[in-house]
């Protein structure tokens, strides 16, 4: 379980790497599944936070809160846009495991991207398979 602080990205790489290490799997795959439809899992640059700021700005322009096209408005003006943003990104990721950890590129990090304005408790299932 991960607690978000509202709209934006939260790096979860270290938590995922700890799960993989505890699994005892040295070679295989790590599958991540987010149990929600208004947030995403993304593999993104982890060195320059401006990258994630730019992604957020672009997504807000692409799918603005309170768009008059949306009929689903009962949960607030940010809910339906959050569902669409989730569809445009990912709610699951599969990563290679080598030497007992996720084999990520130098500048890659795993992020939970919250699309709602308020913070939420989010659940990620981590499944590690291999040898």
Question: What is the role of each PLM region?
Answer:
Residues 1-131:
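Active-site histidine-anchored catalytic micro-motif
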């Amino acid at each position: 379980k991960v607690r978000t602080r509202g709209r934006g990205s939260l790096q979860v790489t270290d938590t995922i790497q700890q799960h993989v290490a505890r699994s005892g799997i040295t070679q295989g795959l790590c599958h991540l599944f987010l149990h929600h439809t208004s947030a995403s899992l993304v593999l993104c640059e982890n060195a320059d936070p401006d990258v994630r700021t730019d992604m957020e700005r672009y997504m807000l322009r692409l799918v603005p809160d309170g768009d008059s096209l949306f009929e689903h408005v009962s949960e607030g003006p940010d809910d339906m846009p959050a569902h669409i943003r989730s569809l445009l990104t990912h709610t699951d990721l599969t990563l290679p495991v080598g030497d007992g950890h996720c084999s990520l590129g130098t500048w890659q990090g795993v992020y939970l991207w919250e699309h709602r304005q308020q913070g939420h408790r989010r659940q990620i299932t981590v499944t590690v398979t291999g040898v």
